[in-house]
């Protein structure tokens, strides 16, 4: 069988950065 490699964590959408 294929060696199970750890899958990368899903990219979480970041909240919009407030412009100051």
Curated annotation (Swiss-Prot):
Q: Where in the cell is it found?
A: Secreted
Q: What induces it?
A: By bacterial infection.
What are the record's GO terms for cellular component? extracellular space
Secreted is among the record's keywords: yes
What parts of the sequence cross the membrane? none
Question: Listed disulfide bonds for this chain?
Answer: none
Q: Which UniProt keywords apply?
A: Antibiotic, Antimicrobial, Immunity, Innate immunity, Secreted
Q: Where is this region: Disordered?
A: 1-20
What GO biological process, any one, is recorded here?
Answer: defense response to Gram-negative bacterium
Origin: domain of life: Eukaryota
Write out the similarity annotation: Belongs to the apidaecin family.
Job of this protein: Antimicrobial peptide active against many Gram-negative enterobacterial and plant-associated bacterial species. Not active against other bacterial species like H.pylori, P.mirabilis, B.pertussis or N.gonorrhoeae.
* Protein name per the record: Apidaecin 3+
Classification of source organism: Eukaryota, Metazoa, Ecdysozoa, Arthropoda, Hexapoda
